[in-house]
From Swiss-Prot:
It catalyses: sulfate + ATP + H(+) = adenosine 5'-phosphosulfate + diphosphate. Keywords: ATP-binding, Nucleotide-binding, Nucleotidyltransferase, Transferase. HAMAP family: Sulf_adenylyltr_sub2 (MF_00064). Pfam families: PAPS_reduct. Pathway: Sulfur metabolism; hydrogen sulfide biosynthesis; sulfite from sulfate: step 1/3. This is Sulfate adenylyltransferase subunit 2. It comes from the Bacteria. It comes from Pseudomonas savastanoi pv. phaseolicola (strain 1448A / Race 6) (Pseudomonas syringae pv. phaseolicola (strain 1448A / Race 6)).
Length: 305
C-alpha cells in the first residue's frame, strides 16, 4: 500500500522538482534571498533538494539599505549557520544620489534601489536564472505569471509572451542575453507557508511575531520606528504621535514602506489561527503596491521581481 502525499508534501515535492530542474538546465542560476518567510521556505527547500551536499548556486540579497535592523541580523546569522555563499548588491548609483523612500517617494526608491539594483546584479554576475519566493495568491499580476517567467535582454517581462506549462513540464530554452525568473512557491498560499514553517521548524525573523513596538500611523498604515533615520523625516507633531502597540508584520520589505498589523499572535500556532480567520491580503501593508492601478505589473514589466 502506497501512502498518499499530504497537501504540503505535494507542494514540497513540486518545489524541489522545480529547483532541481533549474539547477540542471541552466548554466549560472542564483537564489534571491529577501530574508522574509517565503525566502526562508524556499531556501529550506533548496537545501533539502541537494542534501547532504551544499547548494550548487549562490544566494543573493539586493539591499536597499532600508531593511529592518532585525532582518540584517537574521540574514547574517543564517549565512553563518548554513554556510551560504551570499552575494550582497547595493545600487551604487542610488547611493550616490542619496535615494531614500522619504525624499524621493516609494515608486522612485523601489525602481532605483530594487529594480535597477537587481538588474545590475544579474548583469554583473551573468546569471541566467534567478529563483524568487513570489506566490500567485499574493497579488493579481503574480497570479498570471508562470513558474518559469521569461525576461528579455533588458530583464523586462511581457505577460503576453509566456510559454505553456502543461503537466509540470518547463521549457527553459532562452536566447543569449535572455534569462528567466523562477518561482518554486507559485502554488503555495500564505497559510501553506506558515503551516510548513511550523511543521519543518524553519527559523524566521522575529518581526513576524507580535510584540510591543514603537509605531506611527501614516496614511492609515502603522509604520515602525526602526532606527534614527526616520525621525529626521518626521515633524514634531508626527513625533508626538509615536505610540507603543502590540504589532507584527505579515510581509517584510523596506521598513518605511511596510505597515504593521495589530495582533496578539506571539507563536506559530497563533499566526496559523490568525491566518484561518483573516480576510485581508498580506500585502495590504506594502506601500509600493498602492502607487497606482496595476503598479505591480508595471514594475514587473520594467524588471522588478
Amino acid at each position: 500500500m502506497v501512502d498518499k502525499l499530504t497537501h504540503l508534501k505535494q507542494l514540497e515535492a513540486e518545489s524541489i522538482h522545480i529547483i532541481r530542474e533549474v539547477a540542471a538546465e541552466f548554466d549560472n542560476p542564483v537564489m534571491l534571498y529577501s530574508i522574509g518567510k517565503d525566502s526562508a521556505v524556499m531556501l529550506h527547500l533548496a537545501r533539502k533538494a541537494f542534501f547532504p551536499g551544499k547548494l550548487p548556486f549562490p544566494v543573493m540579497h539586493v539591499d536597499t539599505r532600508w531593511k529592518f535592523q532585525e532582518m540584517y541580523r537574521f540574514r547574517d546569522k543564517m549565512v553563518e549557520e548554513m554556510g551560504l555563499d551570499l552575494i550582497t548588491h547595493i545600487n551604487p548609483d542610488g547611493v550616490a544620489q542619496g535615494i531614500n523612500p522619504f525624499t524621493h517617494g516609494s515608486a522612485k526608491h523601489t525602481d532605483i534601489m530594487k529594480t535597477e539594483g537587481l538588474k545590475q546584479a544579474l548583469d554583473k554576475h551573468g546569471f541566467d536564472a534567478a529563483f524568487g519566493g513570489a506566490r500567485r495568491d499574493e497579488e493579481k499580476s503574480r497570479a498570471k505569471e508562470r513558474v518559469y517567467s521569461f525576461r528579455d535582454s533588458k530583464h523586462r517581462w511581457d505577460p503576453k509572451n509566456q510559454r505553456p506549462e502543461l503537466w509540470n513540464v518547463y521549457n527553459g530554452n532562452v536566447n543569449k542575453g535572455e534569462s528567466i525568473r523562477v518561482f518554486p512557491l507559485s502554488n503555495w498560499t500564505e497559510l501553506d507557508i506558515w503551516q510548513y514553517i511550523y511543521l519543518e521548524g524553519i527559523p524566521i525573523v522575529p518581526l513576524y511575531f507580535a510584540a510591543e513596538r514603537d509605531v506611527i500611523e501614516k496614511n492609515g498604515t502603522l509604520i515602525m520606528i526602526d532606527d534614527e533615520r526616520i525621525l529626521e523625516h518626521l515633524t514634531d507633531e508626527e513625533k508626538s504621535r509615536i505610540v507603543k502597540k502590540k504589532v507584527r508584520f505579515r510581509t517584510l520589505g523596506c521598513y518605511p514602506l511596510t505597515g504593521a498589523v495589530e495582533s496578539e499572535a506571539t507563536s506559530l500556532t497563533d499566526i496559523i489561527q490568525e491566518m484561518l480567520l483573516t480576510r485581508t491580503s498580506e500585502r495590504q501593508g506594502r506601500v509600493i503596491d498602492h502607487d497606482g492601478a496595476g503598479s505591480m505589473e508595471e514594475k514587473k514589466r520594467q524588471g522588478y521581481f
